[in-house]
Amino acid sequence: QFEALQGCILAVQEVPAEHTKRYGIVAGQMQSDRIMDVSQIVEKPAPEVAPSRLGVAGRYILTPGVFEQIRQQPRGVGNEIQLTDGIAGLLRNEKVYAYRYDGKRYDCGSKEGFLEATVELALQHSQVGAWFKQYLKALPRE
């Protein structure tokens, strides 16, 4: 897609409204069923002010200009330097696109998501999956 679009591309997935406060959320004009021309990106907005429910899923193709934008940004949400703020700065000078993708994604930034990923992938593992399944079955139920 990068060769065709020649701009930053952010992987996005639809998230439940109550989860917008966990993600960078994008809004813009859909060019196709998967590609959006991004006009706005907001870091962790409350559900009532989120511009959409399309959350950035932590996969990016970025142009070098984002680094200069990050250097110019004050600290954002959580007193952290936010990549989202750098991307928002890019919108003034460059095209930014969102790519809506299908597929399983684990939010390893939360304890619950990390545990989901660990258990599901362990169960699928060719060498330890069968053992892990038996291990889980043998755990005492409290």
Predicted regions and their residues:
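Unchanged
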Residues: 1-121, 126-142
